[in-house]
Amino acid sequence: MSEDFKLDATARNDLGKGASRRLRRLADQVPAIIYGGSKAPVNVSVSHNELLKHLQHEAFFSHVIDLNIDGTSESVILKDVQRHPSKAQVLHLDFLRVDKNTKLHKQVPLHFINEATSVGVKTQGGKVVHNLTQLDVTCLPQDLPEFIEVDLAAIEAGQILHISDLKLPKGVISTDLTKGADHDLAVVTILKAKGGESEEAAE
């Protein structure tokens, strides 16, 4: 993990929909809840402006966050973000506590590289189809990757890459593959050019 994310939070006792609306409107704060582990859930609020800065980084969604709650630090991951349907406004956050000795499950984005220069596209005129854009992984918090790279340089038209074909970082495993071979999903396909086009991979 190459980035460190820190976010300040304030514990709150004034709960309910009305309190949350006032918090967002008058204090420019976002209501949130922290849960998980052996501790009781805690209701907090965070700065909306500060949060928006972090949300601009893809890694914020797949990274352990240092959440400072009134001077007490908690290691958490972002589990859910509720956004306003028409405004650039975050309505609520869910944070999950993590323990450095306990494995966690998290979706990590896939980064596809060398698409345009791959054998299947540049030489054979194929078309890339992304079957997955994120991968469910299981690992310790300190091993959680910001993203997983998928190199298409040597992939030919008509070829399908599955989860089992990916090179995962040390300490990281695919959650799907732990369920059996039937869950070895297609990740990316290069369709053949028209006239010799292959079928898209089914999950």
UniProtKB/Swiss-Prot annotation:
Pfam families listed in its UniProt record: Ribosomal_L25p (PF01386), Ribosomal_TL5_C (PF14693)
Keywords on record: Ribonucleoprotein, Ribosomal protein, RNA-binding, rRNA-binding
KW Ribosomal protein (keyword) present: yes
A biological process from GO: translation
Entry GO MF terms: 5S rRNA binding; structural constituent of ribosome
CDD domains: Ribosomal_L25_TL5_CTC
CC terms in the record's Gene Ontology section: cytosolic large ribosomal subunit
InterPro entries, alphabetized: Rbsml_bL25/Gln-tRNA_synth_N (IPR020056), Ribosomal_bL25/Gln-tRNA_synth (IPR011035), Ribosomal_bL25_b-dom (IPR020057), Ribosomal_bL25_C (IPR037121), Ribosomal_bL25_long (IPR001021), Ribosomal_bL25_short (IPR020055), Ribosomal_L25_dom (IPR029751), Ribosomal_uL5_bac-type (IPR020930)
SUPFAM superfamilies xref list: Ribosomal protein L25-like
HAMAP family according to UniProt: Ribosomal_bL25, Ribosomal_bL25_CTC
Subunit and partners: Part of the 50S ribosomal subunit; part of the 5S rRNA/L5/L18/L25 subcomplex. Contacts the 5S rRNA. Binds to the 5S rRNA independently of L5 and L18.
Reported function: This is one of the proteins that binds to the 5S RNA in the ribosome where it forms part of the central protuberance.
Family indicated by similarity: Belongs to the bacterial ribosomal protein bL25 family. CTC subfamily.
Protein name stated in the entry: Large ribosomal subunit protein bL25
